[in-house]
């Protein structure tokens, strides 16, 4: 998992 994808997912959830 890339940090960028995780960041986008977190922004989406938040």
Curated annotation (Swiss-Prot):
Top-level taxon in the UniProt lineage: Eukaryota
PTM annotation (Leucine amide): residues: 14
Keywords: Amidation, Amphibian defense peptide, Antibiotic, Antimicrobial, Fungicide, Secreted
Main subcellular location: secreted
GO process terms (BP): defense response to bacterium; defense response to fungus; killing of cells of another organism
Subcellular location: Secreted
UniProt keyword Aminoacyl-tRNA synthetase present: no
Name of the protein: Temporin-1Lc
Organism, as annotated: Rana luteiventris
């Amino acid at each position: 998992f890339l940090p960028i994808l995780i960041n986008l997912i977190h922004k989406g959830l938040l």
